[in-house]
Amino acid sequence: MGKIIGIDLGTTNSCVAIMEHGKPVVIQNSEGGRTTPSIVAYTNKGERLVGQVAKNQMVTNPENTIYSIKRFMGRRFEEVASEIKMVPYKIEKGLNGDARVNISNIKKQMSPPEISAATLTKMKETAEAYLGEKVTEAVITVPAYFNDAQRQATKDAGKIAGLEVKRIVNEPTAAALAYGIEKKHEEIVAVYDLGGGTFDISILELGDGVFEVKSTNGDTHLGGDNFDDEIIKHLISEFKKESAIDLSNDKMALQRLKEAAEKAKIELSGAQEASINLPFITADANGPKHLQYTLTRAKFEQMVDHLVQKTKEPCLKAIKDAGLKASDINEVILVGGSTRIPAIQKIVKDIFGQDPNKGVNPDEAVAIGAAIQGGILTGETKDMVLLDVTPLSLGIETLGGVMTKLIERNTTIPTKKSQVFSTAADNQTSVDIKVLQGEREMAAQNRILGNFILDGIPAAPRGVPQIEVSFDIDANGIVHVSAKDMGTGKEQKIRIESSSGLSESEIDRMVKDAEAHAEEDKKLKENIEAKNTANSLIYQTEKSLKEYSEKISSEDKEAIESKIKELKESLEKEDISLIKSRTEELQKASYKIAEMMYKDSSQQNANSQQENGPQSNTSEEGKEADYEVVDEDKK
């Protein structure tokens, strides 16, 4: 088997590593750098430039130099409004609704995976030059909070680059592998990963070569780019006050400001102030204008404090989801170039009550971890097991608009969960399966990832057909859903790849609303279930009453019919307490039918029961979509 390379496909920079003689090695690129700028440019001659050479000409070619493309991976055009404002190149809506880049120098609209593939190709060629052999397989990392579409887009980029992506690994998990490869004792670590475009926090338990993720959280719209953007906005504002000239619409000036902002941010990690000098930034009737400004660390920290604070809540949630206290964490590992910012290191200390561990290189740890995972897959790295998780719950919509969760968030992957449903109406021949992602009890308050229809179900009374719905999340975190009519064997499958990236507000809403409205959701769900139970009992009782009407007394029959009528009236009034009490009354009144059914069954099937074992009545009132739950696979 050939080498499987490990690639950190970053927002700002990318890095490639391999396992060599049992040790991970970071490979230098052709320019001598251990990391490569994730930048792709097209010259006016149509030539493609990748990495540092692309970065070198970005000021003079802003509209055809693509950076931070990771922010657009797997996202719909409507979801990237804030990102569009941060880049000088043109983002358009693709035919399928996704975000595309219009590159004027080659008169072409390109997808984010196509552009990312250029960076991956550079990483592939870097590894091939070092190894002296062809490379066809890779492990590529993604932010832990990347959704299914973003993961799929990353796999697509690998395929375009000529790589078979053997595994998609979450970045914090990869960093933990890099940290723990030589650790023998058990410990709990937190990985705080603030990169160029995304933020992740993961809590892991390490011990005996097992790396088990306990929880993960994050924000796919928060990273170093946002810190740069705050400096840019401040410089534009100050320059406008001084010269009455607005630089915000000058793309070449913006590119120079971007470069200067990034440089100042880096400088302020080690100094108390940074000088920004941009001669000939623009010109007016009076001649050329120069931008000169001194940015202090105190002013910078004031400007970005709201961004720093945004990392706190995900950390607290991850600790809570792991069932731990901050004091239980043995080490906090910092990953991503933005963690060099002193204000970030301070908030990490405030959250976890300890100084962060600086033993891993924040720029290289993720690629090293990816290489280790590659070694695990080839068998070169032995006695190491990686257990990752899915970041958000997955389920389907059931009767009354309820979300029935099949896989809870922070479930270890790969995993497969199944549940058996049935039809909600007599002679129903198809069901519409709506696949949801989120934490709320009601379907409408979660995100629809996709839907599909299972048809060809034989006409039968409701509750009779058995439809098994299965959710399968592979080791890459990619979701597959299937529905199977257990009577006919007919099956329908879907791989969720039509979904796009969750926006910052959507992720925030899913989790925050779930906590804020937990009681409200619980009550609403209980009310719907009470109505479903009542309706199901009425249906079953009326059906049995017809079947056994001749075998029960007229008095019992009248009593049962009276209770059915009363329960129907309470359903019309939507009085939940009355519905519950009258449901109990009808259940008690219908015991007479149950007695008749049992007596009849005992007489007619005595011989059959001796041969096949006791017949159990497993009919069960349950949740209904276009169907109701009749069984559950408790894996």
UniProtKB/Swiss-Prot annotation:
Instruction: List residues modified as Phosphothreonine.
Output: 198
Task: Supply the induction statement.
Answer: By heat shock.
**Per its record, what are the GO molecular function terms?**
ATP binding; ATP-dependent protein folding chaperone; unfolded protein binding
Q: Extract the coiled-coil ranges from the record.
A: none
Identify the SUPFAM superfamilies for this entry: Actin-like ATPase domain, Heat shock protein 70kD (HSP70), C-terminal subdomain, Heat shock protein 70kD (HSP70), peptide-binding domain
A GO cellular component annotated for this chain's UniProt record is: cytosol
Sequence ranges of Low complexity compositional bias: 601-612
Q: Where is the composition biased (Basic and acidic residues)?
A: 620-635
Superkingdom of the organism of origin: Bacteria
Question: What is the role of this chain?
Answer: Acts as a chaperone.
Q: What is this protein called?
A: Chaperone protein DnaK
- Gene name tied to this protein: dnaK
